[in-house]
UniProtKB/Swiss-Prot annotation:
Binds 2 magnesium ions per subunit. The magnesium ions are essentially bound to the substrate and have few direct interactions with the protein. It is found in: Cytoplasm. GMP binds at residues 69, 134-142, 166, 186-188, 194. GO terms for biological process: adenine metabolic process; AMP salvage; central nervous system neuron development; cerebral cortex neuron differentiation; dendrite morphogenesis; dopamine metabolic process; dopaminergic neuron differentiation; GMP catabolic process. Belongs to the purine/pyrimidine phosphoribosyltransferase family. There is a cross-link at residue 115 (Glycyl lysine isopeptide (Lys-Gly) (interchain with G-Cter in SUMO2)). Homotetramer. This is Hypoxanthine-guanine phosphoribosyltransferase. CDD domains: PRTases_typeI (cd06223). The modification Phosphothreonine is found at residue 142. Mg(2+) binds at residue 194. The gene is Hprt1. The active site is at 138 (proton acceptor).
Length: 218
C-alpha cells in the first residue's frame, strides 16, 4: 500500500532569515517578521514532489484540481515540473486541470465555516486520478470537506499535495499524501498565501508581523 511521502520538517525554534538578505517589496517592509522559506528552497522541494506524484499517480489520466486562491503558485510550479517529467517519460499520460475555491479564513484564524465556491461540474473527475493541490493544511477541516465533495464523483484515485502543513493543536489529524514542508503554528504569507488578500505577491514564504496583522485586519 502506498505510504505518504516524507516532508521537510521545520522546527519550532527555526529562526528564519533576516528580511535584508532578500528582495522584499518596500510596501511590505514593516509588515513582516522574517523570511521563513526562501523561494529557491520552495522550488527545489516542489521539483521533488513532482517526481513523487508521477511515481504514484502517473499510470492513468490525472486531473489536477487547484484550490484557489492560495494554491495557484504552488499549483503552477508543481504542474510545470510534472509536465517536464511527463514529456520525457516513455509512458506519458494525459493531464487536465480544474479549479475550485474554498473560504474558511478571516484575519489569521480558520473560522470553521467552510464555503465551497465553484466545483459545480466536477463530473469530469469520474474514473480519473485526481490530484488536489493546496497551499496549506491548518486544522484539516477544509480539506476533509473538499475530499467528501470530490469522492461523490467516484474518481479512480484521490491524492492531495500541499506545500505546507502546520503543527497545531487545532488539527483534526488529517495529513496530505504529498507535503512540501511541515511548519510550526505560525501565520505565514507569501508565495500566493495571503492575509485578507494581501501578501500574495511575495516570492518567499514569510512570517507576518503584528504590525502587518493590524494594518491589514478585516
Amino acid at each position: 500500500m502506498p505510504t505518504r511521502s516524507p516532508s521537510v520538517v521545520i522546527s519550532d525554534d527555526e529562526p528564519g532569515y533576516d528580511l535584508d538578505l532578500f528582495c522584499i517589496p518596500n510596501h511590505y517592509a514593516e509588515d513582516l517578521e522574517k523570511v521563513f522559506i526562501p523561494h529557491g528552497l520552495i522550488m527545489d522541494r516542489t521539483e521533488r514532489l513532482a517526481r513523487d506524484v508521477m511515481k504514484e499517480m502517473g499510470g492513468h489520466h490525472i486531473v489536477a484540481l487547484c484550490v484557489l486562491k492560495g494554491g495557484y503558485k504552488f499549483f503552477a510550479d508543481l504542474l510545470d515540473y510534472i509536465k517536464a517529467l511527463n514529456r520525457n517519460s516513455d509512458r506519458s499520460i494525459p493531464m487536465t486541470v480544474d479549479f475550485i475555491r474554498l473560504k474558511s479564513y478571516c484575519n489569521d484564524q480558520s473560522t470553521g465555516d467552510i464555503k465551497v465556491i465553484g466545483g459545480d461540474d466536477l463530473s469530469t473527475l469520474t474514473g480519473k486520478n485526481v490530484l488536489i493541490v493546496e497551499d496549506i493544511i491548518d486544522t484539516g477541516k477544509t480539506m476533509q470537506t473538499l475530499l467528501s465533495l470530490v469522492k461523490q464523483y467516484s474518481p479512480k484515485m484521490v491524492k492531495v499535495a500541499s506545500l505546507l502543513v502546520k503543527r497545531t493543536s487545532r488539527s483534526v489529524g488529517y495529513r496530505p499524501d504529498f507535503v512540501g514542508f511541515e511548519i510550526p503554528d505560525k501565520f505565514v504569507v507569501g508565495y500566493a498565501l495571503d492575509y485578507n488578500e494581501y501578501f500574495r505577491d511575495l516570492n518567499h514564504v514569510c512570517v507576518i508581523s503584528e504590525t502587518g496583522k493590524a494594518k491589514y485586519k478585516a
